[in-house]
């Protein structure tokens, strides 16, 4: 009984695998069939890789003469050239977007490009290595080499599919940013045009007014302008007055300081001169007194 259940389970699982696997294989190419040149080029690379993975006799023959690796190289370069062209096209549309946002998106996109190129190069290099092993065999059977290559190719295809999806998503984000920047630029132009239309409407309204009203309007504008100029002049005059007061105060302060220094210099000098003069007078008086004769008593 247990053996019967085991057989039924194995049969169901095999049937499910048979139903799911072809569906996955059919869904994979639809990821890059939106019509962009780079997606079409990647689709050609993918289709050629699926054909190589069959390892038919023709594939074996072309692998041995390096035709497969040459064809993969051409398809890889075509794909990356189209990716670069599409990226440059989107960069031109990213003009109004902020520079930091543009730099961040560009860096992320370059990383996705590098990963996709590395995947395709690894596929090509793996097939070239298989071709070398087939030529020398190295004591291994062809079936063993084919089985190992098939396992490697399945892993590489999964990685290639994952990185292709990542690149596709990042390009979509890049395109959305370009569209947003373009819409923002159009909005700015629309606002500018609206402002110009409003100004034209005001000019037309002023032109249609009577001459007296227009003169009054211009008079009001001129009066406002004169008041503004007068206010600025008064402010400037006040500033000059304050500066003059500051200069006057500084000059007076410096004059007082200079006067104090002069007084400090001359007062000791005058005091010394007065003292010397007093000494001189005293000496003269003494000298005069000593030289005057005393009157004689005989006379």
Swiss-Prot record:
Q: Where in the cell is it found?
A: Secreted; Secreted, Extracellular space; Secreted, Extracellular space, Extracellular matrix; Extracellular vesicle
The signal peptide, as residue positions, is 1-18
Region called LDL and other lipoprotein receptors binding, residue ranges = 152-162
Q: Where is this region: Lipid-binding and lipoprotein association?
A: 204-273
GO annotation terms (biological process): acylglycerol homeostasis; cholesterol efflux; cholesterol metabolic process; lipoprotein metabolic process; melanosome organization; phospholipid efflux
Question: Which segments of the protein form a coiled coil according to its record?
Answer: none
In residue numbers, the region (Specificity for association with VLDL) covers 261-273
Record keywords, A-Z: Chylomicron, Endosome, Extracellular matrix, Glycoprotein, HDL, Heparin-binding, Lipid transport, Lipid-binding, Oxidation, Phosphoprotein, Repeat, Secreted, Signal, Transport, VLDL
User: How does it get modified post-translation?
Assistant: APOE exists as multiple glycosylated and sialylated glycoforms within cells and in plasma. The extent of glycosylation and sialylation are tissue and context specific.
Placement of sequence repeats on the sequence: 74-95, 96-117, 118-139, 140-161, 162-183, 184-205, 206-223, 224-245
Q: Which GO terms describe its molecular function?
A: cholesterol transfer activity; heparin binding; phosphatidylcholine-sterol O-acyltransferase activator activity; phospholipid binding
Q: Name one GO cellular component term.
A: chylomicron
Binding positions for heparin?
156-159, 219-226
Region 8 X 22 AA approximate tandem repeats: list its residue ranges.
74-245
SUPFAM superfamilies per the UniProt record, alphabetical = Apolipoprotein A-I
Share what the entry says about its subunit structure, partners included.
Homotetramer. May interact with ABCA1; functionally associated with ABCA1 in the biogenesis of HDLs. May interact with APP/A4 amyloid-beta peptide; the interaction is extremely stable in vitro but its physiological significance is unclear. May interact with MAPT. May interact with MAP2. In the cerebrospinal fluid, interacts with secreted SORL1. Interacts with PMEL; this allows the loading of PMEL luminal fragment on ILVs to induce fibril nucleation.
The task this protein performs is described as:
APOE is an apolipoprotein, a protein associating with lipid particles, that mainly functions in lipoprotein-mediated lipid transport between organs via the plasma and interstitial fluids. APOE is a core component of plasma lipoproteins and is involved in their production, conversion and clearance. Apolipoproteins are amphipathic molecules that interact both with lipids of the lipoprotein particle core and the aqueous environment of the plasma.
Family the UniProt entry places it in:
Belongs to the apolipoprotein A1/A4/E family.
Instruction: Supply the name of the protein.
Output: Apolipoprotein E
What is the organism field in this record?
A: Heterocephalus glaber (Naked mole rat)
């Amino acid at each position: 009984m247990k053996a019967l259940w085991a057989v039924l389970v194995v049969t169901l699982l095999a049937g499910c695998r048979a139903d799911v696997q072809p569906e996955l294989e059919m869904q994979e190419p639809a990821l890059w069939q939106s019509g962009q040149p780079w997606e079409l080029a990647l689709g050609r690379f993918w289709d050629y890789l699926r054909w190589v993975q069959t390892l038919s006799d023709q594939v074996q023959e072309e692998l041995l003469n390096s035709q497969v690796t040459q064809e993969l190289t051409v398809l890889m370069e075509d794909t990356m050239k189209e990716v670069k062209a599409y990226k440059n096209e989107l960069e031109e549309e990213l003009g109004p977007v902020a520079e930091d946002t543009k730099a961040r998106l560009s860096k992320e996109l370059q990383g996705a490009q590098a990963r996709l190129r590395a995947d395709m190069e690894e596929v090509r290099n793996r097939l070239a290595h298989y071709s070398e092993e087939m030529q020398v065999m190295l004591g291994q059977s062809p079936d063993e080499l084919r089985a190992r290559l098939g396992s490697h190719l399945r892993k590489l295809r999964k990685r290639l599919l994952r990185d292709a999806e990542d690149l596709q998503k990042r390009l979509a984000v890049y395109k959305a940013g370009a569209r947003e920047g373009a819409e923002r630029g159009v909005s700015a132009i629309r606002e500018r045009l609206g402002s110009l239309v409003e100004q034209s409407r005001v000019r037309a309204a002023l032109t249609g007014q009577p001459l007296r009203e227009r003169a009054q309007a211009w008079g009001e504008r001129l009066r406002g302008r004169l008041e503004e100029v007068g206010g600025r002049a008064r402010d400037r005059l006040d500033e000059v007055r304050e500066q003059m007061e500051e200069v006057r105060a500084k000059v007076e302060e410096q004059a007082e300081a200079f006067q104090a220094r002069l007084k400090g210099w001359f007062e000791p000098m005058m005091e010394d001169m007065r003292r010397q003069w007093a000494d001189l007078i005293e000496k003269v008086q003494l000298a005069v007194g000593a030289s005057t004769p005393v009157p004689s008593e005989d006379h």
